[in-house]
From Swiss-Prot:
Reactions catalysed according to its record: guanosine(1516) in 16S rRNA + S-adenosyl-L-methionine = N(2)-methylguanosine(1516) in 16S rRNA + S-adenosyl-L-homocysteine + H(+)
Function: Specifically methylates the guanosine in position 1516 of 16S rRNA.
Subcellular location: Cytoplasm
Enzyme class: transferase
Taxonomic superkingdom: Bacteria
The protein's name: Ribosomal RNA small subunit methyltransferase J
């Protein structure tokens, strides 16, 4: 489990939020590795020996740029957002793609199994709901803490199948800005090994009603070595589309 250092300045709202996740409260940072820091109104991810931190902030940075300047055109085509209103993001991570999908007006159910990452994302969604510029989009995201492959079958029984299951498994990309490389370093050290890709894709194809959309680097291998039905390719990113079992179109 991940350590969390709770500063004296942490608000009661933040303290309540972090109690929802199996984290280990500590009185000082660990000697090495990563940890969460709760201070003021924010939860951040820190790496021992580094000054910078990672937070989920949908109102600034890359998230703000994509929200105000666009940048979701390819993903919109891949999910066919006008025809498929419900999406389950089975690999939510820090929620960037969940937020883009929600900004398209889709109802997004986001799954994140790592407690520290889920805590960061939950905190980011909470703050986005308080910001007039992001609250409408954030309201379209419903976060589930747990393993998507384990939770999706049960959720289908109560909510029915989603139109789309979206996957963005971790993938080592070479051409990254220094800031993104540092953030991914934090993230990889925290999360460790990726999920069983074949099992995840199998469950996704059992779950989706219309299609499974997998985000990959433009020149990256197919997920679990399985060729998609078709794909949408951009300058640096590719979206592979798989059809649910027993269907021939999505």
């Amino acid at each position: 489990m991940t350590d969390i250092l709770i500063d004296n300045t942490a608000t009661e709202t933040v303290r309540t939020l972090i109690r929802a996740f199996p984290l280990v409260p500590v009185s000082q940072p660990p000697e090495q590795g990563s940890y969460l820091l709760a201070e003021h109104d924010t939860v951040s991810l820190r790496l021992v020996g580094e000054k910078s931190s990672v937070i989920v902030d949908f109102a600034s940075g890359a998230a703000q740029y994509r929200r105000t300047k666009g940048g979701g055109e390819l993903i919109a085509k891949a999910v066919n957002h006008t025809a498929h209103p419900t999406v389950w993001d089975a690999t939510a991570g820090l929620g960037r793609d969940s937020f883009v999908l929600a900004s398209l007006g889709l109802a997004v159910t986001a799954f994140e199994q790592h407690p520290a990452v889920a805590c960061l994302l939950s905190d980011g969604i909470r703050r986005a709901l308080l910001n007039p510029e992001t609250q409408d989009t954030a309201a379209h995201i419903n976060l589930h803490f747990g393993n998507a492959a384990e939770q999706m079958p049960a959720l289908v029984q109560t909510q029915g199948k989603p139109d789309i299951v979206y996957l963005d498994p971790m993938y080592p990309e070479r051409r990254k800005s220094a800031a993104v490389k540092k953030e991914m370093t934090y993230f990889h050290r925290l999360v460790g090994e990726a999920q069983d890709e074949a099992a995840l894709l199998h469950t996704a194809r059992q779950t989706a009603k219309k299609r499974v959309v997998v985000k990959r680097p433009r020149l990256g291998e197919h997920l679990a070595g399985q060729a998609p039905a078709y794909q949408y390719t951009g300058k640096s990113t590719r979206f592979d589309v798989y059809l649910p079992y027993g269907t021939d179109k999505g």
